Amino acid sequence: MPRNPNSFRLTARNIFLTYPRCDVPKEEVLEMLLHLSWSVVKPNYVRVAREEHSDGSPHLHCLIQLSGKSNIKDAGFFDLTHPRRSARFHPNIQAAKDTNAVKNYITKEGDYCESGQYKVSGGSKSNKDDVYHNAVNAGSAGEALDIIKAGDPKTFIVNYHNLLANVERLFQKPPEPWVPPFELSSFTSVPEELQDWADDYFNECSAAARPTSIIIEGGSRTGKTMWARSLGPHNYLSGHLDFNSRVFSNDVKYNVIDDVAPHYLKLKHWKELIGAQRDWQSNCKYGKPVQIKGGIPSIVLCNPGEGSSYKDFLDKAENSALREWTEKNAKFIFLEGPLYQSTAQDC
């Protein structure tokens, strides 16, 4: 016999509704559910999904997460009236014990709309699998951390630093390509040997398995930095070496090493960078080791004088072996004047 309407009672914080043969647009149903006569507790999150059955009739599935536990005694509380005709729709009503499972089930066809911030349920292994599945597919690092904080608070507290590092690495965006302020064609006084090096390397037909780097020594405001950075996609290492993925990419054509003291580079990665070595690992202080793809040349830029000049550094007796190696792996260019004729390019 039919259930007595007076015996209905729903005490749940998460609710799963199914409206069979309901042709009301899902967006309108979402608004209707948000504006039901809620009393003390209010919806924090609502998702409405449309599913078309094999006979062509539409069903609507809904997940509602409330601010607290409901105490609904009206069996018709969730009944909806079609906004453009007199049809009325009564749903199947259940407490959603596993909101992750319900959320995934109702949106398997991908046709849904939602409002509010979904709160991931935690506890069981399967639920935690969903927590991390949702975190990986979040829109940002902050959103992923919020999902893990709600669904697996113990890991969030105990392993926060490792978790933060992993999430930031997962959502790390590659560095933005540098846009040169001057056209490459504006450098009209490039020495022939320097231009030949660039033409040879950037001609893909003549690309060498292990290309030669180049060391350019010249005074300030000769345009050497702007010229070097205008050749194509590159990493720019200025003053020190930084292989953090926020500024360093393995998907560029060359490195520009600008004003990095030769004694510093010797202590770090002289042969790896100038020798265009492949598949090596950084060991710079204060950072975790980073795997470098390599195989690209470096343009080393320096000023003349003690502490800056790579030639003067290599001419020292204690660096004779390094000088011999460098001369086999790099060309030296000494600028006698600016690489441009205009007074605008003074870098």
Curated annotation (Swiss-Prot):
Cofactor(s), names only, from the UniProt record: Mg(2+); Mn(2+)
Positions bound to a divalent metal cation: E51, H59, H61, E109
Active site: Y105
A single GO molecular function term of this UniProt record: helicase activity
Entry's cofactor comment: Divalent metal cations, possibly Mg(2+) or Mn(2+).
Limits of the CRESS-DNA virus Rep endonuclease domain: 9-118
Nuclease among keywords: yes
Protein name per UniProt: Replication-associated protein
